[in-house]
């Protein structure tokens, strides 16, 4: 049998590193279909830190796409597992027959599914991508994204799968004994990416709580974002006093990020699509409820796991937040499907499906 090849077709260092390390540490030892990767970006020590994997790096999307298409045409039994699909050339290859549906398996990351960019080239490309998506052999996604995808592509097979968020299962009970009183701290957004709509989110938080809460905005990723960070900071200072606004411009190490999250009473995410599942997982693990946009279908995954969900359209106050904290504290977090190690079973099944080992 031909070994499955995994494709990370865009240079997104943080996510790509997470996926590679997860496969190296959790999957490669037990499956030959978890070892071969084609990745856009620089090695930057990844080969050394992932010795169980065979990783081929490419300088750009186009060179990777050309290599994938060549492999697909040379051997029609060759299957590919695309992790997040932000590579237009690969979509066009699927649409034109360069890559066959039986060769194309796609794990949706969220941003690659929704049509939120307003630029002309995106608006011209989206209809073609939609046509190509009808030809995918199987999609893997959160419950909410599967539901969203099925509305336009009901005939494409869909399987539940969660991004492998880095988590320490021993921390699942860390929030149960915590004192929750005093001024609330609210986390706004999951990164410095503009998709977080930071300024609109800050205004929404201020409308709900006024200048009575402390707001923390993590913006250390992506890099080279200074102008937008300053724009968010100035907008925040028009709403909140200086002591109640903390805009973080430096990238935090994982343990420091966990410490930051544990100081929060609430996470506030205004974006209208599934994203930031890693931050959501870490907040929920710490017993911190989250406010979501009703258009973000991840609320379906949360309610399926019996987790409290607050919405941006709700009338929020401290009593409601504290009640959500109480409800979250009563949940057995060891049973949550999108937590580590529970998502591992979904990955093992996804590999078997994509490799053609199970129907």
Curated annotation (Swiss-Prot):
The keyword Transport does not apply. Its EC number is 2.4.1.325. One of its GO terms (molecular function) is 4-acetamido-4,6-dideoxy-D-galactose transferase activity. Keywords: Cell inner membrane, Cell membrane, Glycosyltransferase, Membrane, Transferase. It is found in: Cell inner membrane. It catalyses: beta-D-ManNAcA-(1->4)-alpha-D-GlcNAc-di-trans,octa-cis-undecaprenyl diphosphate + dTDP-4-acetamido-4,6-dideoxy-alpha-D-galactose = alpha-D-FucNAc4-(1->4)-beta-D-ManNAcA-(1->4)-D-GlcNAc-undecaprenyl diphosphate + dTDP + H(+). GO terms for cellular component: plasma membrane. Pathway: Bacterial outer membrane biogenesis; enterobacterial common antigen biosynthesis. It is a peripheral membrane protein. Signal peptide: none annotated. InterPro entries: WecF. GO terms for biological process: enterobacterial common antigen biosynthetic process; fucosylation. Belongs to the glycosyltransferase 56 family. Catalyzes the synthesis of Und-PP-GlcNAc-ManNAcA-Fuc4NAc (Lipid III), the third lipid-linked intermediate involved in ECA synthesis. NCBIfam families: PRK02797.1-1, PRK02797.1-2, PRK02797.1-3. This is TDP-N-acetylfucosamine:lipid II N-acetylfucosaminyltransferase.
């Amino acid at each position: 049998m031909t070994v499955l090849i995994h494709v990370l077709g865009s240079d997104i260092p943080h996510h790509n590193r997470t996926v590679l390390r997860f496969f190296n540490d959790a999957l490669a030892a037990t499956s030959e279909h978890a070892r071969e990767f084609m990745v856009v970006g620089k090695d930057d020590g990844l080969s050394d830190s992932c010795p169980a994997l065979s990783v081929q790096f490419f300088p750009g999307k186009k060179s990777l796409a050309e290599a994938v298409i060549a492999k697909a045409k040379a051997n029609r039994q060759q299957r590919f597992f695309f992790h997040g699909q932000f590579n237009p050339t690969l979509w066009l290859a699927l649409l034109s027959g360069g890559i066959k549906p039986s060769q194309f398996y796609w794990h949706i990351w969220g941003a690659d599914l929704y049509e939120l960019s307003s630029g002309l080239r995106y608006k011209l490309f989206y209809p073609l991508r939609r046509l190509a998506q009808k030809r995918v052999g199987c999609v893997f996604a959160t419950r909410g994204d599967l539901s969203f995808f099925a509305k336009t592509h009901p005939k494409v097979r869909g399987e539940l799968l969660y991004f492998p968020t880095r988590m320490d299962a021993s921390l699942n009970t860390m929030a149960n004994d915590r004192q929750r009183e005093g001024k609330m701290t609210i986390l706004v957004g999951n990164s410095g990416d503009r998709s977080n709509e930071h300024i609109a989110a800050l205004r929404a938080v201020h409308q709900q709580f006024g200048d009575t809460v402390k707001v923390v905005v993590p913006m250390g990723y992506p890099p080279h974002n200074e102008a937008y960070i300053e724009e968010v900071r100035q907008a925040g200072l028009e709403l909140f006093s200086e002591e109640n606004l903390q805009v973080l411009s430096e990238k935090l190490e994982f343990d420091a990020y966990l410490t930051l999250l544990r100081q929060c009473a609430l996470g506030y995410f205004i974006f209208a699509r599934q994203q930031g599942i890693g931050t959501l997982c870490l907040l929920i693990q710490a017993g911190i409820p989250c406010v979501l946009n009703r258009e973000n279908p991840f609320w379906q995954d949360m309610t399926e796991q019996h987790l409290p969900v607050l919405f941006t359209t709700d009338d929020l106050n401290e009593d409601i937040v504290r009640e959500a904290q109480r409800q979250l504290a009563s949940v057995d977090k060891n049973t949550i499907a999108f937590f580590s190690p529970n998502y591992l079973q979904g990955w093992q099944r996804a590999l078997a499906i994509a490799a053609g080992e199970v129907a």
